Amino acid sequence: GLGKTFISIQKDELRQAMIDLINHLVVMNLYKVPPERILLLTPHCLQENTCIHKVTHDVYNCKQCGRCQVGGLLKIAKEYGCQFIVVTGGTLARMKVKEAKPKAIIAIACERDLASGMADVFPIPVIGVLNERPNGPCCNTTVDINKVRDAVELLIDKDNYERNC
């Protein structure tokens, strides 16, 4: 009923406030991270669900065809020299973070997954970028590529890297 809708809206607003606060604190700290120690972490729902080139085991399987935004994110990762991992869920995300040992993370997800994930990896600095869900949750989601690029630009140690254009 109405009460349930109100509570879920409040929860997402609360999560959004937490994400905004953590993003703000990360930005205020002026981190300078070598690009290879920045992890771009995204959910597999960003990939077009009919695509046969699965990117969850190897993001370089992406053919950058333009049907979804995985290709655009891969371009950013290659351009700056960041790590880029696509995961199927929170448990795998936490495991991949442990393996990758990043000094900073740019995470793309919905409010719920971002809020819990940002808390789970503390004290690693995370910039959270909300995905957009035009087809509902967990299916063919999108993200503002410019927000992701801006996050990389904020975290990267500009004095010590060559851009791979």
Residue spans for each PLM region:
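Short His-Asn-centered micro-motif
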Residues: 41-43, 85-90, 106-110
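Short amphipathic alpha-helical segments
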Residues: 53-54, 98, 117-120
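Proline-aspartate-enriched helix->loop->beta-strand connector
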Residues: 101-103
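Ser/Thr/Gly-rich flexible loops in soluble cytosolic domains mediating phosphotransfer, phosphorylation
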Residues: 127-165
